[in-house]
Amino acid sequence: MSVAFAAPRQRGKGEITPAAIQKMLDENNHLIQCIMDYQNKGKASECSQYQQILHTNLVYLATIADSNQNMQSLLPAPPTQTMPMGPGGMSQSGPPPPPRSHNMPSDGMVGGGPPAPHMQNQMNGQMPGPNHMPMQGPGPSQLSMTNSSMNMPSSSHGSMGGYNHSVPSSQSMPVQNQMTMSQGQPMGNYGPRPNMNMQPNQGPMMHQQPPSQQYNMPPGGAQHYQGQQAPMGLMGQVNQGSHMMGQRQMPPYRPPQQGPPQQYSGQEDYYGDQYSHGGQGPPEGMNQQYYPDGHNDYGYQQPSYPEQGYDRPYEDSSQHYYEGGNSQYGQQQDAYQGPPPQQGYPPQQQQYPGQQGYPGQQQSYGPSQGGPGPQYPNYPQGQGQQYGGYRPTQPGPPQPPQQRPYGYDQGQYGNYQQ
Protein backbone atom coordinates (compact mmCIF):
# COMPACT_ATOMS: atom_id res chain seq x y z
CA MET A 1 0.00 0.00 0.00
CA SER A 2 2.89 2.30 0.68
CA VAL A 3 3.59 2.23 -2.99
CA ALA A 4 -0.01 2.90 -3.74
CA PHE A 5 0.03 5.94 -1.56
CA ALA A 6 3.38 7.06 -2.74
CA ALA A 7 2.01 8.09 -6.07
CA PRO A 8 -0.71 10.20 -4.54
CA ARG A 9 1.78 11.84 -2.26
CA GLN A 10 3.94 12.49 -5.23
CA ARG A 11 1.06 14.11 -6.92
CA GLY A 12 0.29 16.05 -3.85
CA LYS A 13 3.74 17.48 -3.91
CA GLY A 14 3.01 18.64 -7.39
CA GLU A 15 6.70 18.78 -7.99
CA ILE A 16 7.30 19.07 -11.66
CA THR A 17 10.91 18.12 -11.85
CA PRO A 18 12.64 15.38 -13.68
CA ALA A 19 13.33 13.70 -10.36
CA ALA A 20 9.73 13.94 -9.24
CA ILE A 21 8.52 12.66 -12.54
CA GLN A 22 10.99 9.84 -12.47
CA LYS A 23 9.85 8.96 -8.98
CA MET A 24 6.30 8.87 -10.12
CA LEU A 25 7.26 6.71 -13.01
CA ASP A 26 9.07 4.37 -10.67
CA GLU A 27 6.02 4.34 -8.46
CA ASN A 28 3.94 3.54 -11.45
CA ASN A 29 6.24 0.65 -12.19
CA HIS A 30 5.80 -0.60 -8.67
CA LEU A 31 2.08 -0.17 -8.94
CA ILE A 32 2.10 -2.13 -12.11
CA GLN A 33 4.13 -4.86 -10.50
CA CYS A 34 1.77 -4.93 -7.55
CA ILE A 35 -1.18 -5.05 -9.85
CA MET A 36 0.39 -7.90 -11.72
CA ASP A 37 1.09 -9.74 -8.51
CA TYR A 38 -2.44 -9.27 -7.30
CA GLN A 39 -3.80 -10.37 -10.60
CA ASN A 40 -1.73 -13.48 -10.41
CA LYS A 41 -3.07 -14.00 -6.93
CA GLY A 42 -6.58 -13.33 -8.15
CA LYS A 43 -7.10 -10.30 -5.94
CA ALA A 44 -9.24 -8.15 -8.15
CA SER A 45 -10.03 -5.52 -5.53
CA GLU A 46 -6.37 -4.73 -4.86
CA CYS A 47 -5.69 -4.68 -8.57
CA SER A 48 -8.49 -2.22 -9.12
CA GLN A 49 -7.20 0.01 -6.34
CA TYR A 50 -3.70 0.06 -7.71
CA GLN A 51 -5.01 0.59 -11.16
CA GLN A 52 -6.94 3.59 -9.96
CA ILE A 53 -3.83 4.97 -8.35
CA LEU A 54 -1.84 4.26 -11.43
CA HIS A 55 -4.49 5.91 -13.50
CA THR A 56 -4.42 8.99 -11.33
CA ASN A 57 -0.66 9.12 -11.64
CA LEU A 58 -0.89 8.84 -15.34
CA VAL A 59 -3.49 11.55 -15.45
CA TYR A 60 -1.27 13.68 -13.30
CA LEU A 61 1.67 13.08 -15.54
CA ALA A 62 -0.46 13.82 -18.54
CA THR A 63 -1.58 17.05 -16.94
CA ILE A 64 1.99 18.00 -16.26
CA ALA A 65 2.93 17.16 -19.77
CA ASP A 66 0.13 19.28 -21.10
CA SER A 67 0.98 22.18 -18.85
CA ASN A 68 4.69 21.77 -19.13
CA GLN A 69 5.80 20.50 -22.42
CA ASN A 70 9.33 20.57 -21.30
CA MET A 71 8.30 17.42 -19.58
CA GLN A 72 8.63 15.77 -22.87
CA SER A 73 12.31 16.34 -22.78
CA LEU A 74 12.34 15.16 -19.20
CA LEU A 75 10.09 12.22 -19.63
CA PRO A 76 11.26 10.71 -22.81
CA ALA A 77 14.17 8.71 -21.68
CA PRO A 78 13.16 7.43 -18.31
CA PRO A 79 9.52 7.73 -18.85
CA THR A 80 9.52 5.78 -21.93
CA GLN A 81 10.62 2.79 -20.03
CA THR A 82 8.59 3.35 -16.98
CA MET A 83 5.77 5.18 -18.50
CA PRO A 84 4.99 2.50 -20.82
CA MET A 85 4.73 0.26 -17.95
CA GLY A 86 2.72 2.66 -15.98
CA PRO A 87 0.18 3.27 -18.55
CA GLY A 88 0.18 -0.25 -19.59
CA GLY A 89 -0.29 -1.52 -16.15
CA MET A 90 -2.74 1.06 -15.41
CA SER A 91 -4.68 0.66 -18.46
CA GLN A 92 -4.84 -3.01 -18.27
CA SER A 93 -5.49 -4.96 -15.24
CA GLY A 94 -5.00 -8.32 -16.82
CA PRO A 95 -2.34 -7.61 -19.32
CA PRO A 96 -0.26 -5.40 -17.23
CA PRO A 97 2.71 -7.56 -17.64
CA PRO A 98 2.59 -7.60 -21.33
CA PRO A 99 1.42 -4.09 -21.36
CA ARG A 100 4.41 -3.21 -19.50
CA SER A 101 6.32 -4.23 -22.45
CA HIS A 102 3.95 -2.69 -24.84
CA ASN A 103 2.37 -0.64 -22.27
CA MET A 104 2.92 2.56 -24.02
CA PRO A 105 0.88 1.51 -26.90
CA SER A 106 -1.56 -0.08 -24.66
CA ASP A 107 -1.63 3.08 -22.72
CA GLY A 108 -2.29 5.07 -25.63
CA MET A 109 -4.91 2.79 -26.62
CA VAL A 110 -6.19 1.53 -23.50
CA GLY A 111 -5.08 2.66 -20.58
CA GLY A 112 -4.45 5.36 -18.98
CA GLY A 113 -7.23 6.07 -21.19
CA PRO A 114 -7.12 9.73 -21.11
CA PRO A 115 -4.01 9.88 -19.18
CA ALA A 116 -2.24 7.55 -21.38
CA PRO A 117 -2.99 9.55 -24.40
CA HIS A 118 -1.98 12.65 -22.66
CA MET A 119 1.04 11.06 -21.37
CA GLN A 120 1.71 9.95 -24.76
CA ASN A 121 1.33 13.43 -25.85
CA GLN A 122 3.81 14.35 -23.26
CA MET A 123 5.92 11.53 -24.20
CA ASN A 124 4.92 12.35 -27.60
CA GLY A 125 8.02 10.88 -28.93
CA GLN A 126 7.69 7.86 -26.84
CA MET A 127 4.23 7.11 -27.86
CA PRO A 128 4.78 8.29 -31.28
CA GLY A 129 2.07 6.28 -32.68
CA PRO A 130 -0.55 7.41 -30.35
CA ASN A 131 0.89 10.75 -29.86
CA HIS A 132 1.02 11.57 -33.38
CA MET A 133 -2.17 9.98 -34.02
CA PRO A 134 -3.81 11.80 -31.25
CA MET A 135 -1.99 14.87 -32.06
CA GLN A 136 -2.83 14.70 -35.62
CA GLY A 137 -6.15 13.50 -34.94
CA PRO A 138 -7.75 10.25 -34.90
CA GLY A 139 -6.55 7.66 -37.17
CA PRO A 140 -7.52 9.92 -39.90
CA SER A 141 -5.03 12.37 -38.79
CA GLN A 142 -2.90 11.25 -41.55
CA LEU A 143 -5.84 11.39 -43.70
CA SER A 144 -6.84 14.42 -41.96
CA MET A 145 -3.72 16.08 -42.85
CA THR A 146 -3.97 14.93 -46.28
CA ASN A 147 -7.54 15.31 -46.02
CA SER A 148 -7.31 18.74 -44.92
CA SER A 149 -5.37 19.49 -47.87
CA MET A 150 -7.20 16.91 -49.65
CA ASN A 151 -10.35 17.96 -48.29
CA MET A 152 -9.84 21.21 -49.64
CA PRO A 153 -9.74 19.63 -52.92
CA SER A 154 -12.84 18.03 -52.03
CA SER A 155 -14.14 21.20 -51.10
CA SER A 156 -13.14 22.39 -54.37
CA HIS A 157 -15.00 19.56 -55.71
CA GLY A 158 -17.61 20.27 -53.38
CA SER A 159 -17.18 23.68 -54.56
CA MET A 160 -17.56 22.35 -57.86
CA GLY A 161 -20.63 21.02 -56.68
CA GLY A 162 -21.50 24.29 -55.38
CA TYR A 163 -19.31 26.60 -57.03
CA ASN A 164 -19.71 28.45 -53.95
CA HIS A 165 -17.39 26.35 -52.18
CA SER A 166 -15.25 26.27 -55.04
CA VAL A 167 -14.06 29.61 -54.17
CA PRO A 168 -13.01 28.63 -50.82
CA SER A 169 -11.90 25.49 -52.19
CA SER A 170 -9.81 27.40 -54.52
CA GLN A 171 -8.02 28.61 -51.56
CA SER A 172 -7.90 25.34 -49.97
CA MET A 173 -7.55 23.84 -53.30
CA PRO A 174 -3.94 24.40 -53.49
CA VAL A 175 -3.45 22.37 -50.55
CA GLN A 176 -6.08 20.15 -51.60
CA ASN A 177 -4.61 19.60 -54.85
CA GLN A 178 -1.53 18.42 -53.31
CA MET A 179 -3.14 16.35 -50.80
CA THR A 180 -6.03 15.82 -52.76
CA MET A 181 -4.56 13.22 -54.60
CA SER A 182 -2.98 11.41 -51.94
CA GLN A 183 -5.56 11.68 -49.49
CA GLY A 184 -8.31 12.19 -51.65
CA GLN A 185 -8.94 8.67 -51.86
CA PRO A 186 -9.22 7.82 -48.35
CA MET A 187 -10.84 10.91 -47.50
CA GLY A 188 -12.84 11.01 -50.43
CA ASN A 189 -14.04 7.68 -49.99
CA TYR A 190 -14.94 8.05 -46.60
CA GLY A 191 -15.49 11.42 -46.69
CA PRO A 192 -18.72 11.48 -46.91
CA ARG A 193 -18.10 13.54 -49.59
CA PRO A 194 -19.47 16.39 -48.04
CA ASN A 195 -17.94 15.92 -44.95
CA MET A 196 -15.14 13.92 -45.07
CA ASN A 197 -14.24 16.86 -46.10
CA MET A 198 -12.47 18.18 -43.55
CA GLN A 199 -13.74 20.79 -45.58
CA PRO A 200 -17.06 19.63 -46.11
CA ASN A 201 -17.17 19.84 -49.71
CA GLN A 202 -14.00 18.35 -50.15
CA GLY A 203 -15.07 15.37 -48.40
CA PRO A 204 -17.31 14.43 -51.09
CA MET A 205 -14.92 15.34 -53.56
CA MET A 206 -12.61 13.47 -51.62
CA HIS A 207 -13.95 10.41 -52.42
CA GLN A 208 -14.08 11.36 -55.77
CA GLN A 209 -10.66 12.18 -55.30
CA PRO A 210 -9.69 8.82 -54.72
CA PRO A 211 -10.30 8.69 -58.23
CA SER A 212 -8.38 11.71 -58.17
CA GLN A 213 -5.53 9.74 -57.30
CA GLN A 214 -5.27 8.99 -60.80
CA TYR A 215 -5.64 12.53 -61.08
CA ASN A 216 -2.96 12.86 -58.74
CA MET A 217 -1.06 14.14 -61.49
CA PRO A 218 -3.67 16.55 -62.26
CA PRO A 219 -3.65 17.59 -58.82
CA GLY A 220 -0.17 18.38 -59.34
CA GLY A 221 -1.32 19.91 -62.42
CA ALA A 222 -4.16 21.16 -60.56
CA GLN A 223 -1.86 22.74 -58.25
CA HIS A 224 -0.11 24.44 -60.89
CA TYR A 225 -3.43 24.92 -62.27
CA GLN A 226 -4.29 26.21 -59.02
CA GLY A 227 -2.22 29.10 -59.68
CA GLN A 228 -4.11 29.61 -62.77
CA GLN A 229 -7.22 28.56 -61.28
CA ALA A 230 -6.79 30.64 -58.41
CA PRO A 231 -8.53 33.17 -60.34
CA MET A 232 -10.90 30.84 -61.71
CA GLY A 233 -10.08 29.40 -58.61
CA LEU A 234 -13.51 28.83 -57.89
CA MET A 235 -14.08 26.86 -60.76
CA GLY A 236 -10.62 26.30 -61.56
CA GLN A 237 -9.86 24.74 -58.42
CA VAL A 238 -12.99 23.20 -58.26
CA ASN A 239 -12.41 22.09 -61.59
CA GLN A 240 -9.11 20.95 -60.87
CA GLY A 241 -9.94 19.40 -57.75
CA SER A 242 -13.28 18.57 -58.71
CA HIS A 243 -12.67 17.97 -62.18
CA MET A 244 -9.50 16.46 -61.76
CA MET A 245 -10.90 14.55 -59.17
CA GLY A 246 -13.73 15.95 -60.60
CA GLN A 247 -14.58 13.51 -62.91
CA ARG A 248 -14.11 10.98 -60.56
CA GLN A 249 -15.16 12.90 -57.77
CA MET A 250 -17.80 14.39 -59.65
CA PRO A 251 -18.97 11.05 -60.31
CA PRO A 252 -19.05 10.24 -56.77
CA TYR A 253 -19.82 13.71 -56.27
CA ARG A 254 -22.26 13.27 -58.89
CA PRO A 255 -23.35 10.34 -57.15
CA PRO A 256 -26.48 11.84 -58.05
CA GLN A 257 -25.25 11.35 -61.40
CA GLN A 258 -26.04 7.84 -60.86
CA GLY A 259 -24.28 5.34 -62.85
CA PRO A 260 -21.98 7.56 -64.65
CA PRO A 261 -20.00 8.41 -61.75
CA GLN A 262 -19.05 4.91 -61.43
CA GLN A 263 -18.58 4.54 -64.99
CA TYR A 264 -16.93 7.70 -64.81
CA SER A 265 -14.87 6.25 -62.31
CA GLY A 266 -13.78 3.83 -64.80
CA GLN A 267 -13.69 6.43 -67.39
CA GLU A 268 -12.21 8.81 -65.16
CA ASP A 269 -9.75 6.36 -64.11
CA TYR A 270 -9.18 5.71 -67.51
CA TYR A 271 -9.30 9.08 -68.81
CA GLY A 272 -8.61 10.30 -65.44
CA ASP A 273 -5.20 9.30 -66.25
CA GLN A 274 -5.41 11.07 -69.45
CA TYR A 275 -6.90 13.89 -67.76
CA SER A 276 -4.82 13.54 -64.90
CA HIS A 277 -2.06 14.56 -66.99
CA GLY A 278 -4.18 16.71 -68.96
CA GLY A 279 -5.24 18.34 -65.92
CA GLN A 280 -7.89 16.01 -66.31
CA GLY A 281 -9.56 16.87 -69.23
CA PRO A 282 -12.54 16.05 -67.41
CA PRO A 283 -13.43 19.36 -66.77
CA GLU A 284 -13.33 20.57 -70.13
CA GLY A 285 -13.57 23.82 -68.66
CA MET A 286 -11.17 22.49 -66.33
CA ASN A 287 -8.96 21.57 -69.01
CA GLN A 288 -9.17 24.95 -70.11
CA GLN A 289 -8.68 26.04 -66.69
CA TYR A 290 -6.02 23.71 -66.33
CA TYR A 291 -4.97 24.38 -69.65
CA PRO A 292 -4.14 27.82 -69.92
CA ASP A 293 -6.36 28.22 -72.90
CA GLY A 294 -9.29 26.55 -71.61
CA HIS A 295 -8.15 27.93 -68.54
CA ASN A 296 -8.82 31.32 -69.78
CA ASP A 297 -12.09 30.45 -71.20
CA TYR A 298 -12.81 28.59 -68.27
CA GLY A 299 -11.63 31.38 -66.26
CA TYR A 300 -14.25 33.55 -67.58
CA GLN A 301 -16.62 30.88 -67.52
CA GLN A 302 -15.87 29.99 -64.14
CA PRO A 303 -16.55 33.28 -62.88
CA SER A 304 -19.51 33.52 -65.01
CA TYR A 305 -20.11 30.02 -64.33
CA PRO A 306 -20.20 30.46 -60.72
CA GLU A 307 -21.77 33.77 -61.01
CA GLN A 308 -24.39 33.00 -63.43
CA GLY A 309 -25.10 29.75 -62.11
CA TYR A 310 -23.94 26.89 -63.73
CA ASP A 311 -26.64 27.12 -66.16
CA ARG A 312 -25.98 29.43 -68.86
CA PRO A 313 -22.56 30.17 -67.91
CA TYR A 314 -22.20 26.62 -67.89
CA GLU A 315 -23.53 26.25 -71.21
CA ASP A 316 -21.50 29.06 -72.31
CA SER A 317 -18.71 27.78 -70.41
CA SER A 318 -19.19 24.44 -71.76
CA GLN A 319 -19.11 25.89 -75.10
CA HIS A 320 -16.35 28.03 -73.99
CA TYR A 321 -14.67 25.17 -72.66
CA TYR A 322 -15.10 23.42 -75.70
CA GLU A 323 -14.66 26.36 -77.80
CA GLY A 324 -12.02 28.03 -75.87
CA GLY A 325 -9.72 26.01 -73.91
CA ASN A 326 -10.95 22.93 -75.31
CA SER A 327 -11.16 24.07 -78.72
CA GLN A 328 -10.35 20.66 -79.66
CA TYR A 329 -12.29 19.59 -76.87
CA GLY A 330 -14.76 22.06 -77.77
CA GLN A 331 -15.01 20.47 -81.04
CA GLN A 332 -15.59 17.17 -79.69
CA GLN A 333 -17.76 18.45 -77.10
CA ASP A 334 -19.36 20.71 -79.46
CA ALA A 335 -19.58 17.83 -81.69
CA TYR A 336 -21.07 15.68 -79.26
CA GLN A 337 -22.24 18.09 -76.88
CA GLY A 338 -22.52 21.01 -78.96
CA PRO A 339 -25.07 20.14 -81.36
CA PRO A 340 -27.57 18.25 -79.53
CA PRO A 341 -26.25 18.36 -76.13
CA GLN A 342 -25.69 21.91 -76.02
CA GLN A 343 -29.20 22.47 -76.76
CA GLY A 344 -29.97 20.05 -74.15
CA TYR A 345 -27.09 21.49 -72.49
CA PRO A 346 -28.64 24.64 -71.46
CA PRO A 347 -31.20 22.76 -69.59
CA GLN A 348 -28.58 20.48 -68.67
CA GLN A 349 -26.54 23.29 -67.54
CA GLN A 350 -29.29 24.42 -65.49
CA GLN A 351 -29.18 21.13 -64.04
CA TYR A 352 -25.60 21.63 -63.85
CA PRO A 353 -26.12 24.08 -61.30
CA GLY A 354 -27.15 21.32 -59.24
CA GLN A 355 -24.90 19.01 -60.89
CA GLN A 356 -22.06 21.26 -61.28
CA GLY A 357 -22.11 22.15 -64.75
CA TYR A 358 -18.95 20.91 -65.67
CA PRO A 359 -19.50 17.76 -64.01
CA GLY A 360 -21.68 17.27 -66.85
CA GLN A 361 -19.04 18.34 -69.09
CA GLN A 362 -16.58 16.37 -67.39
CA GLN A 363 -18.78 13.63 -67.60
CA SER A 364 -19.58 14.57 -70.98
CA TYR A 365 -16.24 14.20 -72.12
CA GLY A 366 -15.44 12.08 -69.30
CA PRO A 367 -17.71 9.70 -70.75
CA SER A 368 -16.48 10.51 -74.03
CA GLN A 369 -13.26 9.41 -72.82
CA GLY A 370 -14.64 7.08 -70.38
CA GLY A 371 -16.35 4.76 -72.55
CA PRO A 372 -17.47 6.01 -75.74
CA GLY A 373 -20.59 4.12 -76.09
CA PRO A 374 -21.66 2.73 -72.87
CA GLN A 375 -20.22 5.25 -70.74
CA TYR A 376 -21.54 7.90 -72.83
CA PRO A 377 -24.84 6.48 -72.39
CA ASN A 378 -24.12 6.41 -68.82
CA TYR A 379 -22.50 9.54 -69.28
CA PRO A 380 -25.69 10.94 -70.31
CA GLN A 381 -27.11 9.35 -67.35
CA GLY A 382 -24.56 10.73 -65.11
CA GLN A 383 -24.97 13.77 -66.96
CA GLY A 384 -28.33 12.71 -67.38
CA GLN A 385 -28.92 14.49 -64.32
CA GLN A 386 -26.62 17.10 -65.28
CA TYR A 387 -27.67 16.58 -68.68
CA GLY A 388 -30.77 15.94 -66.89
CA GLY A 389 -33.04 17.02 -69.52
CA TYR A 390 -30.04 16.97 -71.54
CA ARG A 391 -29.67 13.36 -71.59
CA PRO A 392 -33.26 12.84 -71.93
CA THR A 393 -33.15 15.47 -74.44
CA GLN A 394 -30.72 13.67 -76.50
CA PRO A 395 -30.22 10.39 -75.02
CA GLY A 396 -29.13 9.02 -78.26
CA PRO A 397 -27.49 12.00 -79.78
CA PRO A 398 -25.29 12.85 -76.97
CA GLN A 399 -23.94 9.47 -77.01
CA PRO A 400 -23.10 9.38 -80.61
CA PRO A 401 -21.63 12.78 -80.61
CA GLN A 402 -20.04 12.03 -77.41
CA GLN A 403 -18.44 9.09 -78.78
CA ARG A 404 -16.97 11.12 -81.51
CA PRO A 405 -15.85 13.56 -78.99
CA TYR A 406 -14.73 10.65 -77.17
CA GLY A 407 -12.02 10.18 -79.61
CA TYR A 408 -11.38 13.80 -79.43
CA ASP A 409 -11.40 13.84 -75.80
CA GLN A 410 -8.87 11.35 -75.46
CA GLY A 411 -6.74 12.54 -78.19
CA GLN A 412 -7.12 16.05 -77.21
CA TYR A 413 -6.88 15.30 -73.70
CA GLY A 414 -3.79 13.57 -74.42
CA ASN A 415 -2.63 16.76 -75.95
CA TYR A 416 -3.83 18.76 -73.13
CA GLN A 417 -2.31 16.43 -70.78
CA GLN A 418 0.80 16.76 -72.66
From Swiss-Prot:
For the motif SH3-binding, what are the positions? 392-401
What are the Basic and acidic residues biased-composition ranges?
309-318
The primary location reported for this protein is nucleus
> Which cellular compartments is it found in?
Nucleus
In the record, biological process GO terms are: cell morphogenesis; chromatin remodeling; cytoskeleton organization; ephrin receptor signaling pathway; intracellular signal transduction; microtubule cytoskeleton organization; negative regulation of cell differentiation; neuronal stem cell population maintenance
Spell out the family assignment given in the record's similarity comment: Belongs to the SS18 family.
UniProt lists compositionally biased (Low complexity) regions at: 193-211, 328-337, 345-367, 376-393, 404-418
Record's keyword terms, sorted: Acetylation, Activator, Nucleus, Repeat, Transcription, Transcription regulation
In Swiss-Prot or TrEMBL terms, this protein is called: Protein SSXT
Q: How does it assemble?
A: Interacts with MLLT10. Component of the multiprotein chromatin-remodeling complexes SWI/SNF: SWI/SNF-A (BAF), SWI/SNF-B (PBAF) and related complexes. The canonical complex contains a catalytic subunit (either SMARCA4/BRG1/BAF190A or SMARCA2/BRM/BAF190B) and at least SMARCE1, ACTL6A/BAF53, SMARCC1/BAF155, SMARCC2/BAF170, and SMARCB1/SNF5/BAF47. Other subunits specific to each of the complexes may also be present permitting several possible combinations developmentally and tissue specific.
Checking Pfam families in the record gives: SSXT
Q: Where are the sequence repeats?
A: 344-356, 357-369
- Which residue intervals make up region (2 X 13 AA imperfect tandem repeats)? 344-369
Q: Hey, what's the signal peptide range on this chain?
A: none
Start-end of Pro residues biased regions: 394-403
Q: Where is this region: Disordered?
A: 77-120, 193-418
Q: Which species does this protein come from?
A: Mus musculus
